[in-house]
């Protein structure tokens, strides 16, 4: 899509950084209440808006009768919009000027205040707050949450990588995938990564810095999917740059084939768009730029066709991580700058030779999954 002029990217980045700095670090990586903490901070920021600033910070979404926050890229239904700004003295410009909800006041003054109307919303990684297609303007729900990171020693993480994936070619490919996604949010990596191994060997620990590099400690723009999530009527989980499939497995052969078919449009493009079904709101088509990462302990979690081009599959024979080693690694991650150092390394890694559209390299383990 063609990008329309919206908020200046440097001002948006500065505002978002100021907000993130107000979030207290609890020391918990991806804690369950992280989203609640961020939402509370955002509500506090909204309450500080003056009435004169609202039209510059919001746009009206026509099909949903709702309002789009151009800073935090969130959608508010009319009732929620009224509630958030109920503290403001919003009065109608008609009659004797009775007090009205913030939504009505916004609508009445939209033209005079230079407010925007949108044809809908979108989720387009790498794009600005306002995007256009076929002459229509959309509000982009994606906002860059990548931390800058800090240059430092990443030896503990590279040691874990070598332990999990001893083959240097396979390991280099996975590192390139992570670095490319960190550096290029607007580009689809047209295959998924599947890492198989025994429980407790450090699969989650290995990929944690990558997820941090995409969305910070709050893990924005990354989603850990539940087992039956993609069979749900609503598909909010697709509104992410990275989708993690934990414990990928289907015991029956027919179910393994069905799952592989179900994941095809998510893993690779085309299709160039995916439909997001939303409760109480109109569905919309998001741009298919997500990357899929899967873990499993099952030696045969899915069945692949002989012509498969969508999966890079690695079997790790690493032993279970020692508890003290795991504790030391996570202490380094959370308290000694490990997450920031790995995130920065991924940002700086040279991936100029990596082709995100190419078929992934063949692995011995992938041949075992082919029917």
Residue ranges and their predicted role:
Residues 285-290, 304-371:
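Phosphate-sensing "switch" segment of ASCE/P-loop ATPases
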Residues 264-271, 300, 318, 346:
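Signature of the SF2 helicase/ATPase Hel1-core->accessory helical subdomain module
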Residues 241-268, 301-307:
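Conserved AAA+/SF3 P-loop NTPase catalytic/coupling segment centered on the Walker-B
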Residues 215, 258-284:
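Conserved catalytic/switch belt of AAA+ P-loop NTPases
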Residues 249-250, 297-301, 317-322:
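Conserved nucleotide-binding/hydrolysis micro-motifs of P-loop NTPases
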Residues 2-170, 186, 235-238, 300, ...:
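N-terminal nucleic-acid engagement/recognition segments and initiation subdomains in replication
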Residues 127-248, 259-260, 312-315, 346:
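P-loop NTPase catalytic core of nucleic-acid-dependent motor ATPases
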Residues 232-238, 276-295:
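AAA+/SF3 P-loop NTPase mechanochemical coupling elements
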